[in-house]
A protein has these predicted regions:
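Structural microenvironment flanking redox-active thiols in thiol-disulfide oxidoreductases
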Residues: 46-84, 95-101
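Alpha/beta-hydrolase fold active-site loops
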Residues: 31-32, 109
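Conserved hydrophobic packing residues within short motifs/helices of P-loop NTPase cores
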Residues: 34, 66-68, 91, 112
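Thiol/disulfide oxidoreductase modules built on the thioredoxin-like
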Residues: 85-86, 93-138
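N-terminal "domain-start" segment that seeds a small globular fold
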Residues: 1-24, 133
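Active-site acidic short loop of glycosyltransferases
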Residues: 28-30, 60, 86, 105
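Conserved redox-active cysteine motifs that mediate thiol-disulfide chemistry
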Residues: 28, 36-53
Length: 139
């Protein structure tokens, strides 16, 4: 399945905050925390400061974050990104995309680490794990 550690992360496609096409494979060659979240998910938005810490910790080390949301209201999605200062790439899924089944997600927030080769290195990370776990791989 596409959710096992060591499996190649299934492709995720959508639109970025400017409406341009964006996909997970655009980030091949980098370590990527994929953050599955929604604007109305309080717990998801509580991860934002931890994600900012990770971005700072691995600055210049081939690392990035991709926020993935299935928000139905684009304006709420954009407002949450701005409000939370989530200054990384974001992808809004097309309606009715069943990414939750593809990635075996039982609930959000759901955060995984994908390696430069596109394989899943870790999953279900929270809080300080967002820095501690990538540190095991990023030298």
């Amino acid at each position: 399945a596409g959710c096992a550690i060591g499996a190649v992360a299934p492709e995720i496609t959508g639109r970025d905050t400017l409406g341009n096409p964006i996909k997970l494979s655009d980030f091949r060659g980098k370590y990527v925390i994929v953050d599955f979240w929604d604007s109305y998910c309080h717990w998801c938005r509580e991860e934002t400061p931890w994600l900012r810490k990770a971005l700072e910790a691995f600055k210049g080390k081939n690392f990035t974050i991709l926020g993935v949301s299935d928000d139905r209201k684009k304006e709420l999605w954009l407002a949450a990104i701005k409000e939370d200062h989530s200054n990384w790439d974001h992808l809004l899924l097309p309606p009715k995309t069943d990414i939750f089944t593809t990635y075996c997600i039982k609930g959000i927030p759901h955060l995984i680490l994908v390696g430069p080769d596109g394989k899943i290195l870790a999953k279900e990370m929270r809080h300080e794990e967002l820095t501690d776990v990538p540190a095991k791989f990023i030298k």
